[in-house]
């Protein structure tokens, strides 16, 4: 049974997002489908953020973050991780978290990089799931 209030959002890393969604009993959607309705109706979001080689968010993620920032995020919970690409530095990633917090969001997990060998999906999901 899916936990409809948890939404895992991905761009090109669909298989990884679906694995996380299965572990959480959540729904997974493409970032290209993200709109105000999803943001308003969801309670918790797991964001599989992707960066371009220049260190900027991909265009789809840039648009999605604009959507998040235009919506009241009070009481909503977010866990973010880098699914693809290299984040230029930790401050860049924290800026995303800070923008979500400004909208009222609570960050329950922030920006480990899934491409690092030390990153373990199951461990990360276990660490965030009680707080989603």
Where are these regions (language model features)?
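FMN-binding flavodoxin-like domain, especially the glycine-rich phosphate-binding loop
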Residues: 2-29, 34, 39-132
């Amino acid at each position: 049974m899916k936990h409809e209030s948890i939404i895992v959002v991905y761009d090109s890393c669909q298989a990884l997002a679906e694995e996380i969604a299965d572990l959480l009993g959540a729904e997974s959607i493409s970032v290209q489908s993200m709109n105000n309705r999803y943001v308003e109706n969801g309670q918790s979001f797991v964001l599989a953020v992707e960066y371009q080689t220049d260190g900027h968010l991909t265009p789809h993620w840039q648009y999605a973050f604009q959507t998040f920032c235009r919506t009241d995020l009070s009481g909503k919970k977010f866990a973010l991780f880098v699914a693809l690409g290299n984040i230029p530095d930790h401050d860049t990633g924290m800026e995303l978290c800070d923008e979500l917090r400004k909208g009222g969001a609570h960050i329950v997990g922030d920006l480990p990089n899934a491409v690092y060998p030390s990153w373990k999906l199951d461990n990360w999901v276990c660490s965030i799931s009680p707080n989603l």
